[in-house]
Amino acid sequence: MPITDLHCPRCGSDVKMGLPMGATVKSVTAASRQEPTSDTQKVRTVECRNDHEFFVRFEW
């Protein structure tokens, strides 16, 4: 599982997240949880070190 570097959309702090092989990040948002638009997408809730919750939608 490769590690991907993300940035918190609220404070910009670095966040590391493991994604399945071949996965591509489609969106990173703090606004609202976006549901997957296909069977090959998932949405994960992530927190940065400043306790900001945000959502990562990815596809594989």
Curated annotation (Swiss-Prot):
GO terms for molecular function: zinc ion binding. Changing residue 11 to S: Loss of activity. Disruption phenotype: Mutants show various up-regulated and down-regulated genes, including bop and crtB1. Activates transcription of bacteriorhodopsin (bop) and phytoene synthase (crtB1). May interact with DNA or RNA via the zinc finger motif. Keywords: Activator, Metal-binding, Transcription, Transcription regulation, Zinc, Zinc-finger. This is Transcriptional regulator Brz. NCBIfam families: Brz. It comes from the Archaea. Belongs to the Brz family. Changing residue 52 to F: Loss of activity. A zinc finger (C4-type) spans 8-52. InterPro entries: Brz_Regulator (IPR053463). Disulfide bonds: none annotated. The lineage of its organism: Archaea, Methanobacteriati, Methanobacteriota, Stenosarchaea group, Halobacteria.
